[in-house]
């Protein structure tokens, strides 16, 4: 089945707990709220299990931007100690989102969505893409402006990659714009150039990508962004049991 039962997932958590794990767990799902009914059945079970053991785990997952429209879901996730969520924002350019058929990202202002999730005590991680068809010059700067405005600490960037057996691949193949075959298409978008002929010069896209990445992680700008972001985060409603720091934690502070 597409989703695990609450009983199965809680049993898996118990196995990790019995093995001595006490850190973060990433629930790997392209969209944790894709089946809202099942997610809302699961979350209270996780919360109860966590409460009984002093909240030994923190959770991270992936979700669509419309998580921001569901206050109940955000509250339930926070109460189960979901500390972070990865959003595929892709780009602040609405025309590019429409080209990519990511219509759920165009229904409401993206910066407001990030702020609502943040206010519920869930840290937003986000992915951004450069190189969409019809993209106007300056896309990299617009991503930097958006990340700076919202304060998102962890912003991943990549250049668009066409993957086999997708609508994008089929369209580009029909248009004769692919520059590599299926065997070479690995989907790595942070260290590779686009694997198709874009609608604007590839040199411009590559330069914007590098400049944007450097701007996002310039040390002073990054620290300012992280500081401003955590000032906006809602305080946790759960209370984890006190625990002694590990030697790894102590070495990190020295």
Q: Each predicted region: which residue ranges?
A:
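Glycine-rich phosphate-binding active-site loops on the catalytic face of alpha/beta enzymes
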Residues: 155-161
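Structured loop/turn residues at secondary-structure junctions
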Residues: 30, 65, 160, 200-201
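Basic phosphate/pyrophosphate-binding loop/patch that engages nucleotide-derived ligands
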Residues: 145-154
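Short clusters of hydrophobic/aromatic residues that line enzyme substrate/ligand-binding pockets
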Residues: 97-100, 168, 196
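Flexible glycine/proline-rich, aromatic-decorated loop/lid segments
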Residues: 82, 111-114, 144-145, 163, ...
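Radical SAM enzyme core and accessory elements
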Residues: 177, 181-184, 189-254
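Radical SAM [4Fe-4S] cluster-binding motif and immediate context
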Residues: 1-125, 130-145
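Phosphate/oxyanion-binding loops and surfaces in catalytic or ligand/nucleic-acid-binding neighborhoods
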Residues: 16, 34, 49, 150, ...
């Amino acid at each position: 089945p597409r989703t695990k039962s609450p009983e199965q997932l809680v049993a898996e958590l118990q196995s990790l707990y019995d093995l001595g794990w006490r850190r973060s767990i990433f629930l790997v799902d392209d969209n944790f709220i894709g089946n809202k009914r099942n997610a809302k059945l699961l979350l209270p079970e996780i919360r109860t299990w966590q409460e009984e053991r002093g909240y030994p785990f923190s959770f991270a997952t992936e979700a669509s931007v419309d998580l921001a429209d569901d206050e109940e879901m955000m509250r339930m996730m926070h109460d189960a100690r979901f500390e972070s969520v990865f959003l595929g924002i892709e780009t602040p350019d609405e025309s590019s989102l429409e080209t990519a058929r990511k219509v759920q990202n165009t229904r409401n202002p993206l910066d407001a969505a990030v702020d609502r999730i943040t206010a519920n005590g869930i840290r937003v991680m986000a992915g951004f893409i450069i190189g969409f068809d019809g993209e106007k010059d300056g896309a990299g700067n617009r991503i930097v402006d958006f990340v700076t405005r919202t304060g998102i600490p962890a912003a991943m960037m990549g250049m668009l990659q066409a993957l086999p057996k997708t609508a994008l691949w089929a369209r580009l193949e029909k248009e004769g714009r692919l520059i590599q075959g299926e065997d070479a298409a690995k989907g790595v978008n942070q260290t590779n150039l686009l694997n198709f002929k874009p609608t604007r010069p590839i040199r411009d896209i590559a330069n914007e990508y590098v400049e944007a990445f450097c701007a996002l992680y310039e040390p002073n700008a990054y620290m300012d962004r992280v500081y401003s972001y955590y000032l906006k985060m809602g305080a946790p409603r759960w209370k984890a049991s006190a625990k002694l720091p590990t030697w790894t934690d102590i070495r990190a502070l020295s």
